[in-house]
């Protein structure tokens, strides 16, 4: 894997925004060690714009940053989960043939976006919950409850915030593709 300088900078910016935005002071506590983070929209945006590799690395590194600064210790299981979420949402440009880059974002694209957000959260944080149970002997009922709350909450958050961001991004891209040079 050979990443360009631009891609490395994008990953660093995305991870910093996701990591700092994921701190408890910016989240909404909903369950034991479970916080809904508006920063999930940042992860989704970087994943949609730059694809699965960037999405994975922004999620993985960003969650690591959150854990380092939050003071609750580094939970590699949940760090991996955030990486998987970013990777799955990062499939969006591939599945939509990069239509958003030419200013197209319709209901079908939004549906794909929401499904990827849900599937990403279920698989990503489902992996985290499973690994917590196996590696750390966390109670299954607790991690399953965390998974359900996170998957539902994050999907709604990503869908609502993502809709406005991606709709406006598509409008902006559409306007910039119709520019003509003054005569």
Curated annotation (Swiss-Prot):
Predominant location? membrane
Protein name, UniProt field: UPF0397 protein VSAL_I1988
The UniProt family comment states:
Belongs to the UPF0397 family.
**What are the transmembrane regions?**
8-28, 41-61, 74-94, 110-130, 147-167
Q: Which Pfam families match?
A: ECF-ribofla_trS
What InterPro entries does this protein map onto?
ECF_substrate-spec-like, UPF0397
Report the GO terms under cellular component: plasma membrane
* Species per Swiss-Prot/TrEMBL record: Aliivibrio salmonicida (strain LFI1238)
- Domain of life from the UniProt record: Bacteria
| Gene3D superfamilies assigned | 1.10.1760.20
Per the record, membrane topology reads:
Multi-pass membrane protein
Alphabetically sorted, this entry's keywords are: Cell membrane, Membrane, Transmembrane, Transmembrane helix
The places in or outside the cell where this protein is found are: Cell membrane
